[in-house]
Amino acid sequence: MHVAHLSLVDYRSYPTLELDLRPGTTTFVGLNGQGKTNLVEAIGYVATLGSHRVSGDAPLVRQGAERAVVRAQLERGGRRALVELEITPGKANRARLNGNPVRRTRDVLGVLRTVLFAPEDLALVKGDPGERRRYLDELLVTRWPRIAGVRADYDRILRQRTALLKSAGSAMRSGRADTHTLDVWDEHLATTGAELLSARLALLADLRSPTDSAYRAVSGGQGDLELGYRSSLPLLAEGVATTPGGEAPTRDALREALLASMLEQRKSELDRGVCLVGPHRDDLVLTLGGMPAKGYASHGESWSVALGLRLASYRLLLADDEVDDPGGPVLVLDDVFAELDAGRRERLSEVVADAEQVLVTAAVPEDVPAALRGEHTDRVHVTSGAAVRGD
């Protein structure tokens, strides 16, 4: 798979942009603040409907404009597809696929697959559990786009149940509590939560081997990286399906466990007005040499872990696509080489060099390792919101 053409209208610093892209490596070179990250961010937005830099859409629209438009012409296994996104802050975004409107914007998920490496990735190791849950869920949606609907339903139900807990807790303290409605929302949360949790556990099982081998590749063979899953459910806290070789519970078993745990925690939830049970409380556990990576890994080791997670994502998607799309997902490396020591830079570049399309941003050409600066590499100079191909 590769992006053949990118078109922007009022996206970030670009009033307009038309840019042809080819398979192989393309480096976007420019000083900080010139707009090179905006280009790869736009490509990532087509793939994920989100930015790796900001949580909302408003910053994506150029100052003074009402909306931004991103169009990406894609080629995959000899087939072409055109994805068009219209981003309007405060309103529902709109999408087209091959010129035809889609019913829901998320219906274009899966058309373009990308794996992004960025300086923010260090938060996968050093950040809070929400960063690691986001990593899992974004990869889930990339592999199985229908999970986007499951996640959206879960988030909506979680918000409604939290609001009900707050109001019911106040009513309980006044002696007029009615928990029947809460029982109904418990059922909804348990059903969608079990589906999301089951998908995460299946993904975790698939990730373990490629993550460890990817970590070894970028670290130079130093140590073992293991993945675990920390859950608020006693069923999973006992270690079932959260460690290598564990057998995953069925979705029905997870649903029943969620219901039982919510019932057990109900008084505490009503007192605090928050949902204490569910996949929104869980964490991906990273263990390096038998010790938690967070808090124990050095800066360099933390980078190796983060890169290992991203490379494992790439290898997993590549294996998924090897029949229909031998080239696999588009790799995006956004200013990541400037963060790495020489050894990790060279090892990472050697691992990704064979991808069908690699998009790299760098402040200066020298930041790009030699393995990604071959004769077939395109260079695009980015200055003040303009992108010009050159030597």
From Swiss-Prot:
Cellular compartments annotated: Cytoplasm
Q: What family is this?
A: Belongs to the RecF family.
Record keywords, A-Z: ATP-binding, Cytoplasm, DNA damage, DNA repair, DNA replication, DNA-binding, Nucleotide-binding, SOS response
Instruction: Give the lineage.
Output: Bacteria, Bacillati, Actinomycetota, Actinomycetes, Kineosporiales
InterPro entries recorded: DNA-binding_RecF (IPR001238), DNA-binding_RecF_CS (IPR018078), P-loop_NTPase (IPR027417), RecF/RecN/SMC_N (IPR003395), RecF_2 (IPR042174)
Quote the protein name from its UniProt record. DNA replication and repair protein RecF
What this protein is reported to do is described as: The RecF protein is involved in DNA metabolism; it is required for DNA replication and normal SOS inducibility. RecF binds preferentially to single-stranded, linear DNA. It also seems to bind ATP.
Q: Which HAMAP family match?
A: RecF
Is the keyword DNA repair in the record? yes
What's the source species for this entry? Answer: Kineococcus radiotolerans (strain ATCC BAA-149 / DSM 14245 / SRS30216)
Which amino acid positions bind ATP, per UniProt?
Answer: G30, L31, N32, G33, Q34, G35, K36, T37
The organism's place on the tree of life at top rank = Bacteria
Quote the cellular component terms of the Gene Ontology held in the record.
cytoplasm
Q: Report the coiled-coil segments.
A: none
Q: Which GO terms describe its molecular function?
A: ATP binding; single-stranded DNA binding
Set out the biological process GO terms recorded for this chain's protein. DNA replication; DNA synthesis involved in DNA repair; double-strand break repair; SOS response
| Predominant location category | cytoplasm
Q: Which gene encodes it?
A: recF
Q: Which PANTHER family match?
A: DNA REPLICATION AND REPAIR PROTEIN RECF
